[in-house]
Design a protein with these regions (language model features):
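Hydrophobic transmembrane alpha-helices
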Residues: 143-148, 191-199
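N-terminal transmembrane-helix/juxtamembrane module of multi-pass inner/ER membrane proteins
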Residues: 1-63, 109-114, 118
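Short hydrophobic alpha-helices at membrane interfaces in multi-pass membrane enzymes
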Residues: 154-167
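Membrane-embedded alpha-helical segments of multi-pass membrane proteins
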Residues: 18, 54-61, 134-138, 185-189
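Hydrophobic, membrane-inserted alpha-helices
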Residues: 61-65, 140-145, 164-172
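Interfacial helix-loop-helix junctions of multi-pass membrane proteins
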Residues: 106-109, 126-131, 168-196
Length: 214
């Protein structure tokens, strides 16, 4: 076991991500004084229960990307974990220092599978700590890291499919009334920033490694 861990040190990133997940869980139950995030644009966005499908697909897309990288591309996995960890750590800090919530979630009454799924999401995902949107942040940053890094960078069709799915996931946060437009914008901006930072740091580290091995 110790020998396997020494050859697969990238797995240690999982410990940090698990710790952050636990920290996020704690922030959901602190009972802090929440600041309402509500833009005029939010009232113009319709409630579209069918988009709950894409909201739920996030729970498969994010671990799916990381599992593939963990098993097939260790360097990509380390980049994923670094980007996720840096941004999520900042998010947790924001959730503690400036806790937020939304006040426009509908009752989702009625029949039908999509409304039932919305009620299920509402029951298990409280509308607190919404800014920035982790749903948008994690989906977009994983897309940027995974599909702008070899070997998947050359898979144009797969990269396009991933982009479309991430776009739909981000839109779903608005259309199922889980987030404000402000949350989406902040989450996506943070994803771009985290991707740029990790790309720079890993490129610098690789350049230093190449220089020292010459």
């Amino acid at each position: 076991m110790r020998s396997w861990l020494s050859k697969n040190r990238h797995v240690y990133w999982l410990l940090g991500l698990i710790a952050l997940a636990l920290a996020y869980f704690v922030t959901q139950h602190l009972g802090l004084r929440y600041h309402v995030v509500h833009l005029p644009l939010d009232d113009r966005i319709p409630f579209c229960p069918v988009f709950v499908v894409f909201y739920i697909l996030w729970y498969f897309y994010v671990p799916g990307c990381m599992l593939w990288a963990c098993l097939r591309a260790k360097d990509v996995f380390c980049r994923q974990a670094a980007a996720l960890f840096s941004g999520a750590l900042l998010c947790v800090a924001v959730f503690v220092l400036y806790p937020t919530c939304i006040d426009f979630r509908p009752a989702a009454d009625g029949t039908g599978v999509f409304l039932a799924l919305c009620r299920l999401i509402y029951a298990h995902d409280a509308p607190v700590n919404v800014f920035p949107s982790l749903h948008c942040y994690e989906a977009l940053v994983l897309h940027l890291v995974t599909f702008r890094t070899p070997p998947l960078r050359a898979r144009k069709a797969l990269r396009l499919a991933s982009f479309v799915l991430v776009l739909l996931i981000c839109l779903s946060t608005l259309l199922v009334k889980q987030h404000s437009a402000a949350d989406l914008i902040a989450g996506c901006a943070l994803a771009v920033a985290a991707h740029s930072l990790t790309t720079y740091l890993f490129s610098k580290r690789r350049s230093h490694h190449d220089h020292t091995t010459v």
